């Protein structure tokens, strides 16, 4: 039987940064509105900026600019998001944009020139604009009497001063906000509110649903410090798409897209160790109940035990893996696929 241990008991070789458990709302996209490349570009940049993932943000910025997002729109998006992610991540993202622009491509557009909003010079006007925008976004008047300071900041500054800028429409601003919040832990109430707010500000419900699915299915909401790697060369033994990244020392990081799982298999004359580092997945031995894997879960798979592991239906999944107690003539034996009937019993 597999041994499941807490991450605090790892040896030095096994220790690795793990991410908090996340709930990725990956949903199907059949018969849904097609996301335009410009919307995808804004959303990808916002999601990665919110996570502080500057490595992935740089190519995302290039792709966004290639697909019609203007330079000034990205400046506005990264500036707006300081209200949700803080100045450090806002400034870091702007720094990435500046770095990318050092090698500016011919087709990239500046966009409309920036102009100073009149509301910045009239506090009352900014407050009234913010009150109007907040009411539309919330679907009703909103007054946060519990904390008048936050109530004022939200109305006068976020929905007033910031929304007064003309680089992005209100609908675009909510797309950016939903994407950013999708990349953060612990903000489920705000994310839900802004998904509805995105509709109230002019986006269709279908577009918002498709945006959420796309961010998850493309892996933007996989909050992980571990590289996804390249398509798995052993993909014929998997259902769905997976990726491998060699992290050194005999340790491999395996990334599974939602619903992806490997076939039943057996490790002969060796023990396999699995360490979940991001997302949510499953491990199951033949004839046993499946074990849920979340960041910090460690499983030692005994030799000669038939088993499989893979992602949950609604989440990406990453685990590190290596072998120990390896004997002479150790090998892996790949067996039949895990059927949908077996997999779909899991929640």
Can you name each region flagged by the protein language model?
Residues 76, 85-88:
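Substrate/cofactor-recognition hotspot
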Residues 2-39, 50-66, 89-170, 192, ...:
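Acidic, glycine/proline-rich low-complexity segments that act as flexible tails and inter-domain linkers
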Residues 118-134, 328-347:
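Acidic/histidine-enriched, glycine/proline-rich intrinsically disordered or flexible terminal extensions
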Residues 252-267:
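Conserved short histidine dyad/triad with adjacent acidic residue
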Residues 40-48, 74-78, 172-182:
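Short, structured motif recognition centered on aromatic/hydrophobic residues
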Residues 222-250, 263, 332-347:
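A short, N-terminal "cap"/entry segment at the start of jelly-roll beta-barrel domains
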Residues 295, 303-330:
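Ligand-binding loop in jelly-roll beta-barrel domains
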Residues 261, 268-295, 305:
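A short beta-strand-loop-beta hairpin characteristic of the jelly-roll/cupin
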